[in-house]
C-alpha cells in the first residue's frame, strides 16, 4: 500500500510531469487556451498513458532490450490512433479543436518516459496505477492553466464544453465577467509561458514553505575517542 501512496505523491505533486519534469510542454502550452480543450487533451493523454504502461508491462519480458524503444513507440502509436478515432467519432468538435496536437501525443516524452523508466520494470498493477497518477497530474496542470487563461482571456469558464460532453453541456458555460475584447496575451502562447512559469513558481514556494514546517533533525555532535596508551 505504501508503494501506491508514493506513486500518488510522485504523480500528483513531487514528480509532476508538467511542473517538475517539464515534459509535454508543446501541447501543454498550445492547447490550453480553454478549460475544455485542456481537459480533452489531458484525458486523451491519460488514457494513452495508462494503456501504454499496461501493455509495456505485459510484454517487457518478451521484447529484447535492443529494440524495446521502437516497440514501445509502436504500442503508443497504436493507442493514440485508437483514441484519436474515438474522439473523431464521438467528439468531433473537440477533435477539430485539438488538431495536430492529438496525434502528437505519440511524441509526448511523458508517455515514452514512463514506459521506459517504470512500466518496463514493474508489474501490470503498479504500471497501470503509475500511468493513472502521472496522467492525472498532467491533466490537473493542463486544467488549471486552461482555466486561468480562459478566465483572463475571455471571461468565461467551460466555454465549448459541448464539444467534449455533448449538447447538454452548453449550460455548463459560466460567464464570470463581460469583456468587449479578448485579452490576447492570455490567449496566445506568450501568456501560456507566463502562466506556466507562475504555476512552477507557486509549486516551488509551497514546497519551500512545507520544508520550513518540517521538524529539523538535530545531528549528534561527534564524540572524540580517547586513546589511552598502554605500556
Curated annotation (Swiss-Prot):
Topology relative to the membrane: Multi-pass membrane protein
Keywords on record: Cell inner membrane, Cell membrane, Electron transport, Membrane, Translocase, Transmembrane, Transmembrane helix, Transport
Name of a matching Pfam family: Rnf-Nqr
Domain of life: Bacteria
Annotated compartments: Cell inner membrane
Biological processes, Gene Ontology terms: electron transport chain
E.C. designation(s): 7.-.-.-
Enzyme kind, highest EC tier: translocase
Transmembrane segments: 18-38, 39-59, 69-89, 93-113, 128-148, 182-202
GO cellular component: plasma membrane
Keyword ATP-binding: no
InterPro entries with a match to the protein in the record: NqrDE/RnfAE (IPR003667), RnfE (IPR010968)
Similarity-based family: Belongs to the NqrDE/RnfAE family.
Subunit details: The complex is composed of six subunits: RnfA, RnfB, RnfC, RnfD, RnfE and RnfG.
UniProt xrefs under NCBIfam families: PRK12405.1 (NF009070), rnfE (TIGR01948)
Function: Part of a membrane-bound complex that couples electron transfer with translocation of ions across the membrane.
Record-given protein name: Ion-translocating oxidoreductase complex subunit E
Amino acid at each position: 500500500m505504501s508503494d501506491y501512496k508514493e506513486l500518488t505523491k510522485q504523480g500528483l505533486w513531487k514528480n509532476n510531469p508538467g511542473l517538475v519534469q517539464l515534459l509535454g510542454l508543446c501541447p501543454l502550452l498550445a492547447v490550453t487556451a480553454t478549460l475544455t480543450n485542456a481537459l480533452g487533451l489531458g484525458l486523451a493523454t491519460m488514457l494513452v498513458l495508462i494503456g501504454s504502461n499496461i501493455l509495456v508491462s505485459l510484454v517487457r519480458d518478451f521484447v529484447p532490450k535492443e529494440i524495446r524503444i521502437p516497440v514501445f513507440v509502436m504500442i503508443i502509436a497504436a493507442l493514440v490512433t485508437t483514441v484519436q478515432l474515438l474522439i473523431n467519432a464521438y467528439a468531433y468538435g473537440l477533435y477539430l479543436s485539438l488538431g495536430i496536437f492529438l496525434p502528437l501525443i505519440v511524441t509526448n516524452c511523458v508517455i515514452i518516459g514512463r514506459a521506459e523508466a517504470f512500466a518496463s520494470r514493474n508489474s501490470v498493477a503498479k504500471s497501470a496505477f503509475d500511468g493513472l497518477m502521472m496522467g492525472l497530474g498532467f491533466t490537473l496542470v493542463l486544467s488549471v492553466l486552461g482555466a486561468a487563461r480562459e478566465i483572463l482571456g475571455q471571461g468565461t469558464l467551460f466555454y465549448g464544453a459541448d464539444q467534449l460532453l455533448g449538447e447538454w453541456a452548453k449550460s455548463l458555460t459560466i460567464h464570470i465577467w463581460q469583456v468587449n475584447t479578448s485579452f490576447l496575451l492570455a490567449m496566445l502562447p506568450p501568456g501560456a509561458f507566463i502562466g506556466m512559469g507562475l504555476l512552477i513558481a507557486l509549486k516551488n514556494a509551497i514546497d519551500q514553505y512545507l520544508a520550513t514546517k518540517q521538524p529539523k533533525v538535530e545531528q549528534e555532535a561527534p564524540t572524540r575517542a580517547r586513546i589511552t596508551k598502554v605500556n
